[in-house]
Amino acid sequence: MMVPGHPSAFILHPSLVPVHNADIAAVFEEIADLLEIKGENPFRIRAYRNAARTVSELGRDLAALIEGGAELPKLPGVGSDLAGKIREICARGTCALLERLHRELPPAITELLRIPGLGPKRVRGLYDALRVKTIEDLRRAAGAGRIRELPGFGEKMEARIREAIAARKAAPQRFKLAIAGQYAAALEAWIARVPGVRKVTVAGSYRRMRETVGDLDILVAAAAGSPVMKRFVAYDEVKSVLAQGETRSSVRLKSGLQVDLRLVPPESYGAALHYFTGSKAHNIAVRKLGQAKGLKINEYGVFRGEARVAGDTEESVFGAVDLPWIPPELREDRGEIEAAQRGELPRPIELADLKGDLHLHTKATDGHNTIREMALAAKAAGLSYVAVTEHSRKLTVARGLDPQRLLKQIDEIDRLNGELAGITVLKGIEVDILEDGSLDLPDTVLSRLDLVVGAVHSAFDLPRRKQTARILRALDSRHFTILAHPAARLLGARAAIDVDMLAILRAAKKRGRYLELNAQPDRLDLDDVNARMAREEGVLVAVSTDAHSTFDFSHLKYGIGQARRGWLEAKDVLNTRSLKELRPLLARTMGR
């Protein structure tokens, strides 16, 4: 589904080529949205959503392959029809099916999908009942109190719609970290190839691994006479040049993302990197420390009077105020400076610390690959164990497993573990937490598993007290290991459920349960604040991908970024343990 910051709203025009994988995925997502609004076959809709996910997670650029005359690789869930559409999108920036759907539906109706809580079915309901075709139509209907009268809406939903429309007007556009990361990586590699460029760093909120990014700040050190600025504004993804100068230029990409490039002399590179990495609050706090020592700190360096005393490296900037280097993810003025002064900075977890992944799906439900394929991909990613955790029966849209199918999968995993080398597959389930807090599968079945991952997939609008009680009851279950994506949010599409997270963490600690930090770029849930709270409460966090394809293991880097923002060290993360260390920790959650 399209959400704020998704590039789909910007790519649907043949002039916007070359096309990247994210653009192809966005076209497929919009086709799926429009088909769902029209009420078409859910299997066809799912095929487009699955194809979008597969393409977006692919490490190779499909347009470049096609341009080079290569055949499209065989992709899970992408048959000849979808492959043909990929080639068409790469050539034209759109496809005939999308153009036809746009002709059949009001042109601005997909804008409604950007309002949190409005999925295609609700958009269709609004259109059928109230002829709502635009955000302005929606604002008027909500203001007149007409939406509350529709089935499935009510006063609370109407109020949230009004709030979302108001927030949408006030908030600047932001891009999910993974989307911004695609542009950042491409730009960084392209700029690095410009003659005379010696160093390139993407700074800003992207370097701090914030879950959404407003713009990209790129710093460059280059030899005199380097054509880097001319090349930058001529980059083929540039839609408009906002400013151009000898040391600073700004452009807006065709996706809508603004990128600022600064040419920095070597003696100032560290100071500029610190300054433009931010956050603003962190920089202010560091400058105050400098002022107390008679120093002036800015993007050009550290000065005592007119004399530069530091600034070529970030370490020299921090050292000037008697601080060790502080990792970028911690720089939010949330106690990192005080911790550094006390010598108590955490040693944030690294991607290499992870030994396994405790949440993934396969073709048995809504994944794209077999258990064997997922296990081998995890092994290739450097992991030594994975847990297969399919959806349970209540989640019919994902073809969730009933007890019989789950028992059959348990036998399959046992057979596979006898054949695989270098990777172990754990038997799990992502069981739905029902509205009353009970679990979707009986204990007689759950007891056969290595771990149980529980998740909220429905009744998101319960009041705080009831939603919290629901999760607390689930944590009391006889078999319960990890609370998955605890806030149940989807960035830009669904707000977090209203719960008392501190109460949940304390209950998890008391009952010996764990919480997940879901690394999917659409989720990143736990957020950084709650991840840090988990650390402070002594609750271990599982950084897991929620992988639905072999490509999804690349998302671990985003989960690690969020974990670092939450001050998590390797010891704070459940799946940094070896399998031998992990098994007793899982067994305790299963009543063994």
What are these regions (language model features)?
Residues P18, P42-S249, G256, L261, ...:
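Accessory alpha-helical DNA-binding modules that contact the DNA backbone or grooves
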Residues L177, K363-A364:
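Short acidic-aromatic active-site loops that bind/stabilize oxyanions
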Residues V202-S205, G356-L360, E430:
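Two-metal-ion RNase H-like nuclease active-site motif
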Residues I31-K38, L58, R168-A171, A459:
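Alpha-helix C-capping/helix-to-loop hinge sites
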Residues M209-T362, H368-G382, V386-V388, R393-I423, ...:
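Charged catalytic cores and adjacent phosphate/nucleic-acid-binding surfaces used
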Residues E67-E71, R103-E104, S392-K394, E430, ...:
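Short linear capping/connector segments at secondary-structure termini
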Residues L16-E40:
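Charged, compositionally biased N-terminal leader segments and the immediate start
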Residues M1-P18:
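Short, basic, low-complexity termini and linkers enriched in Ser/Thr/Gly/Pro
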